[in-house]
Amino acid sequence: MRARAVMVCGTTSGAGKSFLATALARWYSRQGLRVAPFKAQNMSNNARVVAGGEMGSAQYFQALAARCVPDVRMNPILLKPESETRSQVILLGQRRDELSAMQWRARAEHLWPTVHGCLEELLAENDALIIEGAGSPAEINLQATDLVNMRVAEAAAAATLIVCDIDRGGAFAHLFGTHQLLSLKHRALIHGFVLNKFRGDRDLLAPGPEMLKALTGVPTLAVLPMWREHGLPEEDGVFDAGPAFGSGLSVAVLAYPHISNLDEFAPLRQEPGLSLCWAREPRSIAAVDLLVLPGSKNVAADLAWLRQRGLDAAVMAHVSADKPTLAICGGLQMLGSEVQDPLGVEGAARGLGLLPYSTEFQPAKRYRHGRHSLAPLSGFWAALSGIGFDAYEIRHGETRAEPHPSARSLRAVADDHCGWQYGQTLALYLHGMLESPAVMRAVRRQHPDARRHSERSRGFHRPALRGGCIDVVARLRMARHDKSMTQIDQLRPTTVTILKSLIPGDRPWTSSPRHPPLMRDAPAAAMPSVLREPPAPGPQSPTSLARFPTTRS
């Protein structure tokens, strides 16, 4: 039996599509259904390594929420911006240069059969498919070449939600305008509106939802409260909402324009005893305890950006003073003497010359995911010695030590040329180390003031990988214990309302085993460690979803 599909579209980027799709994926999974996420095309430099290559982080985490093994078919097209006008195209997990060079309108039609094929396969293999759109479905200049919004909803016969960020203002205009700019056949797929990030008295919304329904025929199914600390990785932008420097360990992450895999730094914002800023000016890193150079999708361009802003001198002063520094992937490459690119993969550049090694880009991209631990470390990083953590590599660069006297102080700390320590600088090709609770505790404890913070302080808000699974609904239910967030518990009952209103029809859902076969039958090595445990029992049996109402409202 073909899966029932639910699609989450938004009026804008950042409306809450990824968050709501994750919540729906978990809720359906808790009913014992076999669930998978899908997003036809994602534009993001945040990616995770899976079998077959890489996929967007948002769909990776949605797969974990659905308790299924992440699969490149869940995000068949990933566009990784390299400049203002060019993106690297990842198709089914692998880089495809010929597609990157293709004119985008022609590329869209060329790729639709792949998108449609992945969609049909996932619909055939699952009971429920949670589909996420991109940006807005009402971009009338893009509708003719749509790969990711209403064309997908139509192909999947998906009951579609439109979610809007009410905190930005103009929510009803956004929803009405989006609805009106859709074709009549696509309007018929819209089953409800969702107002997200609401603060204040819900009674103040009246009679807005009723008037909107009178204009469009579409009900507002839910009003979801503002909740910044949900712990799920952000897909777009930098975490500028993080706390200002206060007590505890101060951390600055360089926010260069082509930063990649920034979602791995979410724990720095969530961890008690740490204070985080995203550094774009030299003064931002002048007095920090720990400086982080993250990954980059365009190392040459981001090195030029550092020099233009005077940040190169600030980084050199920090590292030369032997203050703690963490460099990951592209950041590691920046600290060396040079980046060579004989085949024109990304671009050559002169490095900062702070560590005695150089990097050469290779034509083949390296993908690897596994369990790692670092060799004995010293100084600030000593507490990390021997701690096991899950990590992944996505890179073209190969880095080797140079025949220089200072290279004797460069110590390999990870296998296969994946990491080095040089004084107080730790340089790694391994993404994801900071997502380990044990690693974060070890880092936090390096500052005397941080030891005052209780292990349980703000523990509920820690990143979504912690606690064994991503369970948005359970998180929202637990939030009632936080007096500052008393409205959060609204989401669970309103989520149930959404779910029971979405899918019309007379036939019952096909119930899968409590352990969905996609996860259960996979080899343990293929699964992230968070999936190697039984899922929590659902709050109600699958049969409670046997019949849905035949009308939207």
List the model feature ranges, each with a label:
Residues 477-480, 513, 535:
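Short Gly/Ser/Thr- and charged-rich N-terminal loops/segments
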Residues 532-539:
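Compositionally biased, intrinsically disordered low-complexity segments enriched in Pro/Arg/Gln/His
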Residues 336-391:
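A conserved active-site-flanking secondary-structure segment within enzyme catalytic domains
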Residues 545-552:
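Short, intrinsically disordered C-terminal tails of secreted or membrane-associated proteins
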Residues 1-317, 324, 363, 378-453, ...:
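Flexible phosphate-sensing "switch/lid" loops adjacent to ATP/NTP-binding sites
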Residues 481, 487-490, 515, 540:
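Low-complexity, intrinsically disordered or signal/transmembrane-proximal segments
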